[in-house]
Amino acid sequence: MLSIQNLHAGVDGKEILKGINLEVKAGEVHAIMGPNGAGKSTLSSVVAGNENFEVTKGDILLNGESLLEDAPEERAHKGIFMSFQYPVEIPGISVTNFIKTAINESRKAQGLPEMPAAELLKKIREKAALLEINPNFLSRSLNQGFSGGEKKRNEIFQMAMLEPKVAILDETDSGLDIDALRIVANGVNKLKSSDNAVIVITHYQRLLDYIVPDYVHVLHDGKIVKSGTKELALELEQKGYDWLK
């Protein structure tokens, strides 16, 4: 599904990613861990198409098709979703209107007509119920006045509505108390299927108690230095990252 091949990328002439290779298949959950400054958020930004970063070598393929020439919105239309560590506030635009616009822009890019209002409303209600989201939440301005947990739940709701092929969750556990973390993780688990894949980027093992990965990769100094299963995350929790240098 997603194939990252010998990816080198950086910003302002400084190389940050130094040859990343990663194969993510449909139905899989991959966790990417590593110390601060390892390149985790850079990797997610580069896959999503952040234009502040320059790819100098390698490729990113989605279902065999290179994404490198695609703008961020084109990658989103093709099925790449990224939840941000610090979601932006958009006063005056409700959660529902934002979702409506995002879905219809994606459909337009695929040559499809706008989703009928009744169908959209039905889908919103179904996904909100699935994720235990209060309907009043959907009429609020996007992220304005939201708590950390509400912002993250909103992003998982967007993921539910957009149904991406690959969802990249960047530090989704950042700033969440244990109850909010559990709610967000349960939402992600409910959205997993054999048709999509999830990449979880995290500094801490605790998120992986709730979103259990098939594979764990350790990023250090712009390279994947070790890969394994859930047990690797537990080992990192006990030993830290220094033993991998």
What are these regions (language model features)?
Residues 2-4, 17-19:
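Conserved structural motif at the start of ABC-family nucleotide-binding domains
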Residues 33-35:
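The feature captures the beta-strand-to-loop junction immediately N-terminal to the Walker
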Residues 59-75, 143:
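ABC ATPase NBD Q-loop/coupling interface
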Residues 82, 86, 92-108, 123:
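Q-loop/switch helix immediately C-terminal to the Walker
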Residues 159-160:
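ABC ATPase C-loop
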Residues 215, 219, 223-245:
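Conserved beta-strand-loop-alpha-helix hinge in the C-terminal portion
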